[in-house]
């Protein structure tokens, strides 16, 4: 079966996190760029038809393009991530898609709260501590990462590698 996901790419973070993601984030090795997940899992690829694509286009158009920054590292139990601020644009996208597709909650409903984030690495505590220190030093000398979100991206993994299906431009800012 071919899963799909909706993401917002964050290319601005790559210079800081790509080396960690390649080693400690399996999704990076499967062709997923630095991103904020809007909704995963989404539909199976065979369920994505013209009507779904049109609906996603309308959802994206209903959310204004937005700027954000990445300056703070945070943790989940076995993950290190960058927290986008403000995170309201990402939350608005997740909420809008979930309202339109209520049978597909974010992360299959595993978590009571969805936290927009850019994953840096998964690992044990010592590994994550080491990466976090290195990342904070690099970001302190390089300045705040400033990003701009202008599109929602539908990706699929029918080949074992995630590939782009369609990009949906966000509304004018």
Specify the residue positions occupied by each region the protein language model found.
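Active-site/acyl-donor-binding loops of N-acyltransferases
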Residues: 155
